[in-house]
């Protein structure tokens, strides 16, 4: 599995430092507010778990499972909601927790849906951002790290459901995903 990687972009320590920094900022920004953290499954599960431990304010969590990849390395642009939220977010401050922001088409669809539910506020935190890939008019307020336009795996990010369990983030060798 490790031999399939070209290089490591973020070590375990790098990721934990990012979580600490983002957690401190989110604690400051959401102190005393009715915060609901919405994790986008499956990719954000590890990031969300580490991040919310560092947000020192009352919060609740919920999840959405949304897909626009359908097994490949490129977003199809067609967003399918597999699992919607389990509770109401009306009059709450909502923080979408995402693993990676690339084209933005999936996140744009999610934000439009959630904004229609009469939230107080809606922001996005993403561990990774690939601004060069953006197609939709959307940005994350909180960004862990901007990365180059390479296919990354690990720490929740997958290729065909594999590599999610890596404790770091790396780039796959092109021959692994071009077959």
Curated annotation (Swiss-Prot):
Cofactor(s) it depends on: Mg(2+)
Catalytic reaction(s) noted: IMP + diphosphate = hypoxanthine + 5-phospho-alpha-D-ribose 1-diphosphate; GMP + diphosphate = guanine + 5-phospho-alpha-D-ribose 1-diphosphate
Pathway(s) the chain acts in: Purine metabolism; IMP biosynthesis via salvage pathway; IMP from hypoxanthine: step 1/1; Purine metabolism; GMP biosynthesis via salvage pathway; GMP from guanine: step 1/1
Superkingdom of the organism of origin: Bacteria
Residues binding Mg(2+): 98-99
Binding-site residues for GMP, renumbered to this chain: 130, 151-152, 158
Pfam family, one: Pribosyltran
Residues spanning the membrane: none
GO biological process: GMP salvage; guanine salvage; hypoxanthine metabolic process; IMP salvage; purine ribonucleoside salvage
Active site: 102
Location(s), subcellular: Cytoplasm
Residue positions binding diphosphate: 42-43, 164
PANTHER family: HYPOXANTHINE PHOSPHORIBOSYLTRANSFERASE, HYPOXANTHINE-GUANINE PHOSPHORIBOSYLTRANSFERASE
Protein family membership: Belongs to the purine/pyrimidine phosphoribosyltransferase family.
Name of the protein in question: Hypoxanthine-guanine phosphoribosyltransferase
Gene field: hpt
């Amino acid at each position: 599995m490790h031999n399939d990687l070209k290089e490591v972009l973020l070590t375990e320590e790098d990721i934990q430092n990012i979580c600490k920094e983002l957690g401190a900022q989110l604690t400051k920004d959401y102190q005393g507010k009715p915060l609901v953290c919405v994790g986008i499954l499956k990719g954000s599960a590890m990031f969300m778990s580490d991040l919310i431990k560092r947000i020192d304010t009352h919060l609740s969590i919920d999840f959405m499972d949304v897909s626009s990849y359908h097994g490949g390395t490129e977003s199809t642009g067609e967003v399918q909601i597999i699992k919607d939220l389990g509770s109401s977010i009306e009059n709450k401050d909502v923080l979408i927790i995402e693993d990676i922001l690339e084209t933005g088409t999936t996140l744009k669809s999610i934000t439009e849906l959630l904004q229609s539910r009469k939230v107080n506020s809606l922001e996005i935190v993403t561990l990774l951002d690939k601004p060069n890939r953006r197609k939709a008019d959307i940005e994350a307020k909180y960004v862990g790290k901007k990365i180059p336009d390479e296919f990354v795996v690990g720490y929740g990010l997958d290729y065909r459901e594999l590599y999610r369990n890596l404790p770091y983030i790396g780039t796959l060798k092109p021959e692994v995903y071009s077959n």
